[in-house]
Amino acid sequence: MPFDEKYFSTHTYANVTFAKYSMYWWSNRFYATLARRYGRKGARLLEVGSGMGHLIGSLEDTFETYGMDLNHWAVKQSKAVIKKTNLQTASAQELPFKDGVFNVVIIKHIVEHLPDPKKALREIGRVTEKGGTLILATPNLDSLLKPWKGDKWIGYQDPTHISLKHPDEWSYLIEKAGFDLVDIFSDGFWDVPYVRFIPKQIQKLIFGSLGGFQAVTGWVFLPYRWGESVMMIARKRK
């Protein structure tokens, strides 16, 4: 399936709202907190797969921001609302940037869509400066509650998820791309419902409270198996 306007209206994005205080608003705020924590103020930051530009736009006040996406439509939409960020259409597997120019690279829920994520991570390693930071997130095949969902697990619902891997496989590819893993954690259990006969809203409180607390506070504490996404922080070797 092509990554065009139809993709954003029929798959994961179809029911997504980025309104203030929504789940995705808090999620982007959390990623922005991580970028500011590990990045150098005023340095260049790249988001690979910037989509509609919600995350990269929130970082314009801290970094010299760059965003790229394979989706022409998404880049066009982003340009209509983001004014400072350098946005362009490009492939994650062939980044149109010089070597070692970025202090921070964010690739959030993109690698699972790529036919060759190994090549994409090598490209990210190439454009990241020595000592720079990679922030990566992808569906977590080792999630403790994934067996409860079976075939209905969120990671299986998008047919473009063609490169799902276990966290140890991702960490291996990241290290082969020239990075050292700094931290690995998760974003909590948000793929409700997990059990029958309990109202969905109650399950959000039961299962989602820890992930919500982590997102709101910016305090990273959830073990990597305690959630539907695995998140990795890595540092480019000097």
Model-identified regions with their sequence ranges:
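A short His-aromatic
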Residues: 109-113
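A short glycine-rich, Lys/Arg-flanked "PGG" loop and its adjoining helix->strand segment in the class I
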Residues: 118-130
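Conserved beta-strand signature within the Rossmann-like core of class I S-adenosyl-L-methionine
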Residues: 132-138
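Short, glycine-/aromatic-enriched active-site segment of Class I SAM-dependent methyltransferases
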Residues: 139-161
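A C-terminal cap/extension of S-adenosyl-L-methionine-dependent methyltransferases
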Residues: 149-150, 183-238
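Short alpha-helix
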Residues: 162-177
